[in-house]
Amino acid sequence: MNRLQERYEKEVVPAMMEKFGYKNIMQVPKIEKVVINMGVGEAKDNPKVLESAVSDLQIIAGQKPVLTRAKKSVANFKIRENMALGCKVTLRKTNMYEFVDKLVSIALPRVRDFRGVSAKAFDGRGNYSLGIKEQLIFPEIEYDKVDKVRGMDIIFVTSANTDEEARELLRFLGMPFAQ
């Protein structure tokens, strides 16, 4: 069991039960999965670009990404149906906790001019979305081997019923929300 998972069970669960008045431990919200998506628009012209994005994402997540493909052909964007345009990874259980721990304690503090993540990016159902502009904030990525700076979307899917519960859960887990 890693550091964040232990902290969730020993500190977060009792604190959430007290704050929201849950009667049962199973009512306490938890992170169900974390989805990391990297859209690579240039992949339509140069498929090699997608390979480097896949390798970057694999290094960051510690799990092999799956390619995301275009659902429909769009002439204005010069894309055809089933053309590979990005990659994504769904992390659960141990990998998920390791990634969230790494993101909160190492990667986010390395962002330039970092003042906290937006507290408004909840979807109304207790899920949180976070956009990152460059993959270089992760310690596993070597600056010299990066061909192009790419961003990614990170989605935290929680079992919380409201945004307030999800915000408190992520705050207890160390997510630095902007004031």
From Swiss-Prot:
GO molecular function: rRNA binding; structural constituent of ribosome; tRNA binding
Source domain of life: Bacteria
Pfam families in alphabetical order: Ribosomal_L5 (PF00281), Ribosomal_L5_C (PF00673)
A Gene Ontology BP annotation from the UniProt entry: translation
Alphabetically ordered keywords of this record: Ribonucleoprotein, Ribosomal protein, RNA-binding, rRNA-binding, tRNA-binding
GO cellular component terms given for this protein: ribonucleoprotein complex; ribosome
Protein family membership: Belongs to the universal ribosomal protein uL5 family.
Main function: This is one of the proteins that bind and probably mediate the attachment of the 5S RNA into the large ribosomal subunit, where it forms part of the central protuberance. In the 70S ribosome it contacts protein S13 of the 30S subunit (bridge B1b), connecting the 2 subunits; this bridge is implicated in subunit movement. Contacts the P site tRNA; the 5S rRNA and some of its associated proteins might help stabilize positioning of ribosome-bound tRNAs.
Matches recorded under HAMAP family: Ribosomal_uL5_B (MF_01333_B)
NCBIfam families, A to Z: PRK00010.1
Subunit structure: Part of the 50S ribosomal subunit; part of the 5S rRNA/L5/L18/L25 subcomplex. Contacts the 5S rRNA and the P site tRNA. Forms a bridge to the 30S subunit in the 70S ribosome.
UniProt-recorded name of the protein: Large ribosomal subunit protein uL5
Protein's organism: Clostridium perfringens (strain 13 / Type A)
Gene that this sequence comes from: rplE
